[in-house]
Amino acid sequence: MTVLHSVDFFPSCNASVAIEPRLPQADFPEHHHDFHEIVIVEHGTGIHVFNGQPYTITGGTVCFVRDHDRHLYEHTDNLCLTNVLYRSPDRFQFLAGLNQLLPQELDGQYPSHWRVNHSVLQQVRQLVAQMEQQEGENDLPSTASREILFMQLLLLLRKSSLQENLENSASRLNLLLAWLEDHFADEVNWDAVADQFSLSLRTLHRQLKQQTGLTPQRYLNRLRLMKARHLLRHSEASVTDIAYRCGFSDSNHFSTLFRREFNWSPRDIRQGRDGFLQ
């Protein structure tokens, strides 16, 4: 497995924060690093396999990656990221207690993937741009300024996560996307889902297409197919069982959609013929 080292990314041995844009981020094999990072998805789509679990990521997704987590990117489509790297929550010169603002693992569950709406994403970009502008400056005031900006970034992300509610359609769409990640195998009635998240069906279609580039049903099918591909690679369940577990009532229809999406059959994936990045 590839290991990325801080010496290759931080501008100096004293720097506590570094900005690493990926515009775009291509498919990248499983790796980990000796530093932590906050991955901010600007736009595009892709699959983020995080500690073996696949997540669909789109504009507004924020991922918190620790130094012992392993992850990879695959099936990327114009995926543009900005990575905010930091050595460790306790390696800041002017800040203490940052760990309390980061996601906390509880009973083995780590909430690694958050979502923010477009207005918050714009504020995030501004903070990151300010940090990036100061990267070449190593004096104490500049170091303190970068660390304060990092603190502001964490506060903004945490506040927007805690306050993500039904006050506007962008927030409701983010909640809907998070709901689909957990309920992708359910029979989805889009009229009922639109009502559940207080969206008109037209607004749901328009905003989801704007954010993901896909219609709601196309997005759901891709999500199901991604989950199925993960199970084909990492479980012994039969193709038919996997199809049903991922929300497909007809295994033949599943195989047709699968080949159309990936240009490989489920059997090809099971046998590793696609040359999956390890």
UniProtKB/Swiss-Prot annotation:
What name goes with this protein? HTH-type transcriptional activator RhaS
**Location of the HTH araC/xylS-type domain:** 174-272
Query: Where does the record place the site Interaction with sigma-70?
Result: D241, D250
Q: Which GO terms describe its biological process?
A: positive regulation of DNA-templated transcription; rhamnose metabolic process
- Alphabetized UniProt keyword annotations: Activator, Cytoplasm, DNA-binding, Repeat, Rhamnose metabolism, Transcription, Transcription regulation
Q: Which residues form a coiled coil?
A: none
> Which InterPro entries has this protein been placed in?
AraC-bd, AraC_XylS_family_regulators, Homeodomain-like_sf, HTH-like, HTH_AraC, HTH_AraC-typ_CS, RhaR_RhaS-like_N, RmlC-like_jellyroll
Please give the GO cellular component terms listed in this UniProt entry: cytoplasm
**Can the keyword Aminoacyl-tRNA synthetase be found in this entry's annotation?**
no
Disulphide bond pairs: none
Query: Which region is the signal sequence?
Result: none
Where in the cell? Answer: Cytoplasm
Q: Which HAMAP family match?
A: HTH_type_RhaS
Q: Which domain of life is it from?
A: Bacteria
DNA-binding region in chain numbering = 191-212, 239-262
Q: Which organism is it from?
A: Shigella flexneri
Task: State the organism's lineage.
Answer: Bacteria, Pseudomonadati, Pseudomonadota, Gammaproteobacteria, Enterobacterales
Give the NCBIfam families listed for this entry.
PRK13503.1
